[in-house]
């Protein structure tokens, strides 16, 4: 993601559901600019536990999602927001399902935003989330160092500094020289519900 989004002149989208894939694919067809569509193989056929929501009824033939428009997956309860007991999670692709796994037990306290489009970004939706909750967690599959979300974190902290109650946190893959071929080691490398839950606990204590 960090490589593609730095190539001038192209748009980058990353759907997390079958319906979003169709809507963004049609938007890419109609867009005069080159569009790169990323797909996470872990979401194919939704065979992995926790990714069932990526399956969806096929939308109508004219279903198009505007590129650059994020999707709210889960919302927080107004009471929790008013009491300062809520936070917002911003992610995309498979990160949506890792986040949903981590959110179990925090019903009504977390709002989950699926970016869907990495370039252009939905800055309005992200800034609204910052002002609404004051605590933000970014989830990405990229390694922590030099990842796509670092740029988003810097921009959000600059634009919403007076509204934040805690530093913006990022969850990503473990920094390693290479991705292991062993499936168990690969799972240990990637983000998961537990690693995200640790950051949720940390932010909610602020």
Residue ranges and their predicted role:
Residues 41-42, 46-206:
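Thiamine diphosphate
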Residues 8-9, 32-33, 107, 134:
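Residue-level detector of structured alpha->beta connecting loops
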Residues 1-31, 173, 199, 204:
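Conserved thiamine diphosphate
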Residues 37:
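Non-catalytic, usually N-terminal nucleic-acid engagement modules in DNA/RNA processing proteins
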């Amino acid at each position: 993601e960090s490589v593609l989004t730095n190539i001038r002149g192209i748009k980058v989208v990353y759907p997390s559901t079958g319906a979003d894939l169709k809507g963004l694919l049609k938007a890419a067809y109609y867009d005069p600019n080159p569009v790169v569509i990323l797909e996470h193989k872990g979401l194919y056929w939704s065979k992995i536990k926790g990714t069932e929501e990526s399956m969806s009824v096929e939308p109508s033939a004219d279903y198009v999602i505007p590129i650059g428009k994020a999707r709210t997956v889960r919302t927080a309860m107004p009471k929790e927001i008013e009491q300062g007991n809520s936070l917002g999670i911003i992610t995309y692709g498979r990160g949506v399902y890792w986040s949903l796994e981590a959110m179990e037990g925090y019903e009504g306290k977390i709002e989950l935003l699926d970016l869907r489009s990495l370039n252009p970004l939905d800055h309005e939706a992200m800034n609204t989330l910052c002002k609404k909750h004051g605590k933000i967690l970014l989830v990405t599959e990229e390694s922590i160092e030099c990842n796509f979300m670092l740029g988003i974190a810097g921009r959000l902290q600059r634009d919403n500094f007076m509204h934040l109650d805690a530093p913006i946190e990022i969850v990503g893959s473990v920094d390693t020289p290479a991705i292991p071929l062993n499936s168990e080691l690969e799972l240990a490398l990637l983000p998961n519900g537990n690693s995200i839950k640790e950051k949720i606990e940390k932010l909610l204590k602020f």
